[in-house]
């Protein structure tokens, strides 16, 4: 037993040990001996029976009942289909049994339609009514057949009614009569039927379950959202109230951007909460039905869809995946494009898509198709006018399809045939082509061109272009494609539009005119022609710009790699390079979007092995589609819950895998995505949820006896935080009331635990992805403990950067909790509490001030600041500053008087190599951010935390300077492209350890990052401030410099003789080779060349008195902590912050120097005079070492606690 958690027993809600929780059992008060069983379900049943027998059964009954009902539903499913549930289907059933509405995000072959049909039968057996809404008549027929087959197999009979256009007249009449009379348990129709027959036949009906298969068709009539809500039991009045909340939240978002609107924000929040309470009351008092929406491929647009969020607690996501499992390759052609394509098809076999770039157009696509036909290939051309080829391809009558590579092209977007499409060939790089006068411009192409050429414009024009670009992007964000086409047509035909659309047209027009104007500038054209990433071509006397069309490449190549039940099919893409510059641009943009993107020469891949993998995946997909999948493959798709600390991190991770669906669980938001082999729900825990209590044991730690020796067990309870005054505490003095200000507006982390337990019930496994250090490990341990009884499997995942490859790798390498790290953190917290409480109480007694407090690590640090201040005040002296005729400035200490001339006594000039510094560790970053940016340590850590959580930098709490291979690759790419490959000098900088140095996660500098965020290529869950960019720039430059060749300078060191003594001057005369100084200034000043014996006139004299010793900044103090082995990367900033918060130290305004206050000096003197050995620098350093030993399993943590306890008794309690 390591700890006790109050209020966490899953049965009685009382106190329970970590051991019992890990054994998935209730507390000892409920069951004297723990129950063991071979699997989770059996354990739940056995514990329930034991509790019942003992007469202590309480909340465990809910857990038992849920598992029992799932078993019953699964038995029926087995009878109806012959299969057991997939993990994902089991999750869906658990949600339904608990009355939750949700959006299903799941890949091809996950049995969504089968599940919808089955669950309606289950509801019918239970006397409940269901409605299945599908997009088309063939799907109505298919769904009805599924239901009938299942009823027959399961031997049940329920009343089924369906309606579609192919029914005979008499059948239609009978169906309509039965619908009108409510003579059915299950109704199946198209979404069109819901839209047209609602008022006449459905308005008065009430359903327990509505299953919407394919939300895209359903949403074509946005009124269907209101209709579905009415059918589930809401009134129009409640729907209108929810609509009010949506509008109020929009207003609130705007107010939060403005300054000084706190009062309005508070009032709006109150109004929103009031309406939300009304809605919640209505839901409680009325038995509202369940809505299940099978995921969209497009994104659900418009505000009306948000009604589902307000009334049913979920948001529809998009099933569109951004995962790629594609081998990207290229060929530099040695013969005609047609011959290269023919040659490739002979090597690759059947099942290919061939994309012709837009500059070659439909004519070339026709020529290529005819050429391939003449060579004996079964191939068809597909275009908007001729889609016949699609059916022939699907039926296997043709082996290849040819189409033009445009974003909305028929075979670029419309094909989802994971079992048939094996590879894609690009007969030229996908590109946009623009004539200089921009004939027939489209909105997306204009945005693409603007984004590419803004960097070539003069400053003033660039700023104008950036504003126009941002406006146009913002305006079109929620406009569907068909409406954009109307705007484009209006511009071409020179006609006006109505209202908002006319406003968009106006801005579009301005953007086109802006481009036409800047493209007449010869300097701009010259710069474009020299750029290696876009192409300038003359065709028939006309100039054209060609830029890569990366969106089309992603979409088109993506046809070869689809998400299916069990993973992502492997695909192959081959680009025949017809323009090297546009190809370079395409690669660069792919790397911006996909951290893991790499492209190889086609002849360098192992083609046989790639094709074998491609074909194995196609076999699996066919089996899934035909329903012949084996049990073993079925369990490839697990439902999993990933828990991280912060909402930013949760949102960033979710965004890697498409547009997530969202569910509100209590006060938390869960994001759901599919990653092929996992249906992943991502949730933010909100960081630390537990802390030591103050009302039990010795300051929250029980002291028990084990073999006559004391044994220490911390007691934890949830952390409470007052939303009004910010006070944080653990023990209630009065339940629900803040002990500091009396407010009832208090958040208890218990609510977060309940939300996590609710989600834990649904899934097969939990992955805990808290920060990769001892603190993160302790949070993970707490989460593991309190969730253990609710789920069969819990693992810890660790990642040092928030990027898609790092997350997927962490999931693959999931491990158990590192108990030694946890023990080290337990000791750190207990030691902190004991010393803190004991010393604070002494300070209260002596100074009669209950606001004072003390800690072991802060005390020596406070001492350094006190000592430095003393030296500062005692070191005042006279300074003389001389400026010489050649511009050199020198300062002389202890000097007063006039000087007219000085002489160069000695000079050494030599060539010197200056190496770059290693990339940042935490302490070095804090020092530089303090020195160059004027940031406090706390501010820097918060900004770095944001950059980490947003996936822009690696983990920022580290004392390692090591750079991984990934890091070296990033530097290589940036240096080669932006500076020159000859500057690259890879360095590992030290041994590989648990952590890496702080570095960027992509080869993108600050200017480019700002542009990519502006262009929407990088989308972040929160806005970055100017200070985020300043810190990113510091980290980026230091890292890139660390991977560049040394600089070489002509170094000079001179001794200058003055009447007051000699002064040394050093610097460089000139840079011989710039090396890393291309990205960061050198640490030396440039000085003029001097000669021995040279006499120099003094042109300016300044005299002043000042202290010789300067005061510390936050950066200086952190450098000392690192140097003297006190504190850790995770505590440096906190230690300084604590001293400032307690008022022991203040920071001067301008130069940000640290000055001890009178209170700080008195407290320090008292502590050192009474408890010197306890708070000495040496003892603190020793303890840091002991913590490391516990972490490395070299010290027994109980033994360490015994020593600490003895030490405190010896020094304080005696």
From Swiss-Prot:
InterPro entries recorded: AAA+_ATPase (IPR003593), DEAD/DEAH_box_helicase_dom (IPR011545), Helicase_ATP-bd (IPR014001), P-loop_NTPase (IPR027417), Reverse_gyrase (IPR005736), Topo_IA_2 (IPR003601), Topo_IA_cen (IPR013497), Topo_IA_cen_sub1 (IPR013824)
Reaction catalysed by this enzyme: ATP + H2O = ADP + phosphate + H(+)
Record: residues binding Zn(2+) 1: 9, 12, 27, 30
Positions that bind Mg(2+): 645, 771
Enzyme nomenclature, EC number: 5.6.2.-
Cofactor note: Binds 2 zinc ions per subunit.
Motif (DEAD box): 213-216
Family named by the database record: In the N-terminal section; belongs to the DEAD box helicase family. DDVD subfamily.
Free-text domain note: Introduction of positive supercoils requires the cooperation of both domains. The helicase-like domain probably does not directly unwind DNA, but more likely acts by driving ATP-dependent conformational changes within the whole enzyme. A beta hairpin in the 'latch' region of the N-terminal domain plays a regulatory role in the enzyme, repressing topoisomerase activity in the absence of ATP and preventing the enzyme from acting as an ATP-independent relaxing enzyme; it also helps to coordinate nucleotide hydrolysis by the ATPase domain with the supercoiling activity of the topoisomerase domain.
Name of the protein described by the UniProt record: Reverse gyrase
């Amino acid at each position: 037993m390591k700890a006790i958690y109050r209020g966490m027993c899953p049965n009685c809600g009382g106190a329970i040990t970590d051991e019992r929780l890990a054994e998935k059992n209730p507390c000892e008060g409920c069951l004297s001996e723990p129950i063991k069983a071979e699997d989770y379900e059996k354990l739940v049943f056995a514990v329930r029976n034991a509790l019942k027998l003992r007469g202590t059964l309480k909340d465990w009954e809910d857990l038992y009942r849920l598992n029992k009902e799932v078993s019953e539903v699964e038995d029926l499913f087995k009878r109806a289909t012959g299969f057991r549930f997939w993990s994902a289907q089991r999750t869906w059933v658990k949600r339904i049994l608990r009355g939750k509405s949700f959006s299903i995000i799941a890949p091809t072959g996950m049995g969504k339609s089968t599940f919808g049909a089955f669950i309606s039968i289950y509801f019918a057996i239970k006397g409940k009514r269901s409605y299945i809404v599908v997009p088309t008549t063939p799907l109505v027929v298919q769904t009805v057949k599924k239901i009938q087959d299942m009823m027959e197999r399961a031997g049940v009979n329920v009343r089924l009614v369906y309606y579609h256009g192919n029914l005979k007249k008499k059948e239609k009449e009978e169906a309509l009569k039965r619908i009108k009379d409510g003579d059915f348990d299950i109704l199946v129709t198209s979404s069109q039927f819901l839209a047209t027959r609602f008022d006449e036949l459905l308005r008065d009906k009430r359903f327990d379950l509505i299953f919407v298969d394919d939300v895209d068709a359903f949403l074509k009539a946005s009124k269907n959202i209101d209709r579905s809500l009415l059918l589930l039991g809401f009134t129009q009045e409640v729907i209108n109230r929810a609509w009010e909340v949506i509008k109020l939240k929009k207003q609130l978002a705007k107010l939060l951007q403005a300054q000084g609107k706190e009062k309005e924000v508070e009032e709006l929040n109150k109004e929103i909460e009031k309406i939300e309470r009304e809605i919640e009351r209505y839901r409680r008092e009325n038995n509202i039905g369940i809505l299940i929406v099978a995921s969209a491929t497009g994104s659900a647009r418009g505000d009306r869809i948000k009604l589902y969020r307000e009334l049913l607690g979920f948001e529809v996501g998009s099933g569109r995946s951004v995962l790629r499992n594609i081998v990207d390759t290229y060929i530099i052609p040695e013969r005609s494009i047609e011959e290269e394509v023919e040659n490739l098809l002979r090597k690759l076999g059947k099942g290919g898509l061939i994309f012709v770039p837009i500059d070659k157009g439909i004519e070339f696509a026709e020529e290529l198709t005819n050429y391939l036909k003449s060579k004996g290939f079964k191939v068809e051309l597909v275009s908007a006018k001729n889609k016949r080829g699609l059916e022939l391809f699907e039926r296997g009558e043709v082996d290849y399809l040819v189409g033009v590579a445009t974003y909305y092209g028929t075979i670029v977007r419309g094909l989802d045939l994971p079992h048939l499409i094996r590879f894609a060939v690009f007969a030229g790089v996908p590109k946009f082509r623009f004539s200089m006068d921009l004939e027939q411009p489209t909105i997306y192409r204009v945005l693409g061109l603007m984004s590419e050429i803004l960097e070539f414009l003069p400053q003033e024009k660039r700023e104008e272009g950036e504003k126009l670009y941002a406006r146009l992007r913002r305006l079109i964000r929620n406009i569907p494609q068909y409406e954009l086409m109307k705007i484009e047509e209006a511009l071409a035909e020179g006609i006006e539009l109505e209202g908002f659309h006319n406003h968009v047209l106006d801005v579009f027009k301005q953007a086109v005119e802006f481009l036409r104007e800047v493209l007449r500038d010869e300097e701009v054209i010259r710069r474009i022609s020299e750029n290696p990433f876009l192409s300038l071509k003359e065709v028939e006397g006309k100039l054209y710009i060609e830029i890569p069309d990366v969106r089309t490449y992603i979409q088109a190549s993506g046809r070869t790699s689809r998400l299916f039940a069990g993973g992502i099919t492997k695909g192959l893409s081959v680009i025949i390079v017809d323009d090297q510059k546009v190809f370079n641009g395409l690669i660069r943009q792919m790397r911006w979007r996909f951290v893991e993107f790499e492209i190889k020469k086609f002849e360098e891949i192992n083609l046989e092995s790639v094709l074998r993998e491609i074909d194995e995946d196609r076999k699996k997909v066919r089996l899934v589609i035909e329903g012949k999948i084996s049990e073993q493959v079925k369990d490839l798709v697990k439902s999993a819950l990933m828990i991280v600390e912060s909402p930013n991190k949760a949102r960033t991770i979710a965004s890697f895998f498409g547009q997530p669906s969202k569910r509100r669980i209590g006060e938390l938001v869960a994001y759901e995505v599919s990653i092929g082999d996992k249906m992943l729900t991502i949730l933010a825990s909100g960081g630390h949820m537990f802390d030591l209590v103050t009302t039990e044991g010795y300051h929250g730690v029980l002291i028990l006896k084990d073999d006559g020796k004391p044994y220490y067990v911390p007691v934890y309870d949830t952390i409470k935080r007052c939303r009004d005054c910010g006070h944080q505490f653990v023990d209630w003095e009065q339940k629900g009331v803040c002990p500091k200000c009396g407010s009832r507006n208090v958040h208890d982390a218990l609510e977060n635990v309940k939300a996590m337990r609710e989600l834990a019930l649904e899934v097969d496994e939990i992955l805990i992805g808290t920060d990769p250090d001892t603190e993160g490990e302790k949070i993970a341990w707490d989460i593991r403990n309190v969730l253990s009884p609710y789920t069969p499997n819990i693992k810890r995942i660790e990642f040092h950067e928030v990027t898609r490859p790092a997350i997927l790798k962490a999931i693959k390498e999931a491990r158990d909790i590192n108990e030694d790290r946890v023990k080290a953190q337990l000791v750190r917290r207990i030691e902190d509490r004991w010393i803190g409480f004991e010393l604070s109480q002494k300070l209260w007694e002596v100074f009669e001030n209950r606001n004072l407090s003390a800690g072991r690590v802060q005390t020596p640090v406070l001492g350094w600041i006190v000592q430095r201040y003393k030296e500062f005040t005692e070191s005042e002296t006279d300074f003389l500053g001389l400026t010489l005729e050649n511009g050199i400035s020198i300062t002389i200490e202890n000097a007063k008087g006039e000087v007219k001339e000085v002489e160069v006594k000695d000079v050494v000039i030599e060539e010197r190599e200056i190496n770059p510094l290693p990339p940042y560790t935490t302490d070095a970053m804090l020092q530089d951010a303090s020195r160059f940016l004027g940031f406090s340590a706390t501010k820097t850590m918060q900004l770095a935390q944001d950059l980490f959580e947003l996936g822009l930098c690696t983990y920022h709490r580290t004392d390692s300077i090591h750079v991984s291979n990934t890091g070296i690759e990033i530097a290589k790419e940036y240096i080669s492209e932006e500076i020159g490959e000859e500057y690259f000098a890879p360095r590992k900088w030290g041994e590989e350890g648990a952590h890496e140095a702080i570095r960027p996660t992509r080869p993108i500098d600050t200017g480019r990052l700002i542009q990519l965020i502006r262009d929407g290529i990088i989308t972040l869950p929160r806005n970055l401030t100017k200070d985020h960019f300043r810190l990113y720039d510091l980290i980026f430059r230091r890292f890139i410099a660390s991977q560049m060749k040394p600089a070489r300078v002509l170094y000079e060191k001179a001794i200058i003789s003055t009447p007051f003594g000699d002064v040394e001057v050093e610097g460089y005369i000139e840079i011989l080779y710039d090396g890393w100084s291309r990205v960061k200034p050198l640490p030396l000043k440039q000085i003029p060349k001097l000669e021995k014996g040279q006499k120099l006139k003094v042109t300016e004299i300044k005299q002043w008195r000042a202290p010789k010793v300067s005061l510390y900044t936050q950066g200086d103090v952190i450098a000392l902590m690192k140097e003297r082995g006190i504190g850790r990367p995770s505590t440096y900033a906190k230690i300084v912050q604590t001293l400032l918060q307690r008022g022991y130290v203040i920071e001067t305004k301008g130069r940000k120097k640290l000055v001890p206050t009178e209170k700080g000096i008195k407290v320090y003197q008292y502590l050192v005079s009474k408890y010197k050995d306890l708070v000495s620098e040496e003892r603190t350093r020793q303890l840091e070492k002991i913590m490391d030993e516990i972490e490395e399993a070299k010290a027994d943590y109980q033994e360490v606690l015994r020593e600490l306890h003895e030490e405190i008794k010896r020094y304080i309690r005696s």
